[in-house]
Amino acid sequence: GAATMASTLDVAGNTSVGGTLFVTGAGTFDNNVSVSGNLVVGGTATVVGAMSIGGALSVGGATNLLGTVTVAGNAGFLGTVRVSGATSLDGALVATGAATFENNVSVSGNLVVGGTTTVIGAMSVGGALSVGGATNLLSTVTVAGATGFLSTVRVSGATSLEAGLVVGGKAEFNNDV
């Protein structure tokens, strides 16, 4: 079933929910989080351990994810997002603020970021890629759909763009394109 928290939630141990988890305020999880349905956090979210979501993930504030992240559905972030572990999404990812991925990122749908974006590991996008701020991609990049950068872009690794590329600022590719 669904669990609803009417305020902030601060959990010290592992969190496992068999259905959907709604938190109207901030959510702080000091260990692993497993939710078989959707996870919705109205405020900021911090997860110290690994996160596995069977449905969609939605966060209304700044997000700090320190472990691996696996989401079966779409992920939406209304603030900045920082992910330290590997990220795997079976849907789309939309972040209105800046996004920092300190490991590999795999998104089967579209990846849309409104602010600056930094990806330290390899990035694979099954749909379109759109970034509104300056972009720094430090490893290989593979994008199946259209790719658009509204500001400067710097890519250090090999790049495979299977559809069109639009860049609104300076573009620097340090490897094969």
Describe these PLM feature segments.
Residues 1-177:
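Intrinsic low-complexity, repeat-rich intrinsically disordered segments enriched
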